[in-house]
Amino acid sequence: MEKIRQVKTEEDVIHLLQVALEHEWAVSFEYVVHAYSMPKGRFLYEDPVLKQATDARAQTIQIGIDEMYHALQLGITLARLGVDPGFGTDEVVRHPLVGDNLRRDKMTEEMVTDLYQSAEIEPGAFPEIENMVWNISFDEVRHIAQFGAMIDAVEAAFGAGAAGYPPNPDREHRGDLRLLHGLNRLENEAMHRYLKYVMMFNAHQDLSQRLFKNSVNHMRHWDKLSGLLVRLGDVVAIENAVTDAAGVERSRLPMPAAYPGGNRLSALETLPDLERGLVAKYEEAVALDLPEEVRAQLRLHLALTREHVFTQDKLLANARRIKGVV
């Protein structure tokens, strides 16, 4: 990760935020991928902040959600500075061993904490941004302590060789897995496309909050689908990953790097068809011969996505109806 020590100008601030944003996008995805490679409830540790026994998988998911909110804060700040935040990411990596993933997570947090806390921002020049950076940095300090405790507990109980769930080698030959992976890709894209528009329209409280609600729904669907894949004997895929001889997966493009829409109308025009595409895929999925608990979860996703179709149709119609809305 690039080191940025002197931040004196607006250009310096933008560069700092862009470097940080690429990190935050990556880990908001990577930590959840690591979490769903762990068995639920198996890797317990004493959390140094929560002060109680905690499931490493559950807390790693929560840390990933923290990072998504960091990305949103950074992106909105960049948008207010007149800069397209972008969706480029640092490299996303998954190791076969749980301990290796957790060590990577802790190392990554240490690197980004150094980025935030060692950046010497010109005193008084950008006080709100400086305050945000320090606030985010102490979330990362907490994450370092939590990942460290996870590593110690996992290796004390299971040694260094505790393996995570591997990708299912038959996923390309199983229609159910292909369909759920396809849904996961669409949910990941939908979540980030909505976040792009939340950042674009951050000054429009009504629109941005409606879009943010849908983004959170898609994030939850992606999270639940990742759990369903484990239930069906697979793990969430890392898009565009290359796997080496040791089974380590790496990707620099775990999600689309660009999304359409440059103003309110052109952005809103993209969303009804996105939601209808998801509805069609969910309707296909609930018709499969799957365990009832899986189908029940998919039906919940389908119902909420139908609500999104209704909402996005009306948001688009209203944007077309009212003159002067930009």
State each model region's role.
Residues 1-326:
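Non-heme di-metal
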